[in-house]
Amino acid sequence: MITGILLAAGAGSRFGGDKLLFPLADGVPLGVKSGRNLLDGVDCAIAVVRLADRVLARLYEEAGLRIAYCPDAAAGMGASLACGVSAAPDADGWLIALADMPFIRADTIRSVAGLLRAGASIAAPRHQGRRGHPVGFAKDFLHDLTSLGGDRGAASLLAVHASSLQHLECDDPGILIDIDNRADLANIRHTPGADFRAQSLAGCP
C-alpha cells in the first residue's frame, strides 16, 4: 500500500491569511484541492496539520483523508514529515506532498506511486529538466523519514541518496508550482503549457 503524506502544518505567513482555506475559482479551498488530488493517486492519504487547525482537519476528513496532528509543527517541515510517516509505519511506501501545491494532476501522482510499486527506492516527477513534487520513498526509508526533524525535510534525504532517485518525465507544470503568496495565484495564468488556469483565483489581477 502506498500512502500519501500531505504536509499541511505550515503557518503560511507570507500569504496574508489562512492559505490552505483560501478558495480557488471552483470554490474548493486550496489545501483541500491538494489533498483530493493526492488521494486520487494513492491508496490512502494522511494530512498532517497543526493542533489548532480543526477546521482544516474537518475538511480533510470530509475529503477522505486521515488526520495526523503534529504537536511539533512549528519546528519545521521535517517534524511534520516524520509525524505523517509515523502515522503509517506499515505502508509499502510514502508519497510526500505539499498542501500548497493544488495544481499537480492526479495522474502524475498516480504514476509516481506506480514507480514505487514497481520497485523504485525513491521516485519524483520531472518537468522540463526540473524535479518537482510529490516525492516517493519506499519502505526501506522508514527510519530515515521518521528521524527527520526541524527544517530537515525530504530534500536532505534526496541529497544523500541521489543515485537511488528514479524520475518520472511528465508534461505537468503543476509539479513545480507552490503557492506562497497571492501573487503566485495570478502568476500561474502565465505559465506556458498550464492547463489549470481556470482553477486559479477568480479575483486575481
Model-inferred region functions:
Residues K33, N37, C83, S111, ...:
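Alpha-helical scaffold segments in soluble metabolic enzymes
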Residues M1-A99, F103-R131, S163-C170:
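Nucleotide and nucleotide-moiety/phosphate-recognizing core
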Residues H143-P205:
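Conserved alpha/beta core of the MobA/IspD/sugar-nucleotide pyrophosphorylase nucleotidyltransferase superfamily
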Residues H133-F137, I177-I179:
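Short glycine- and hydrophobic/aromatic-rich loop-to-beta-strand nucleating segment
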Residues L20, P29-L30, T108, D140, ...:
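Residue-level recognition of oxygen-bearing side chains
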Residues G12, F22, L142-H143, A186:
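Nucleotide phosphate-binding site architecture
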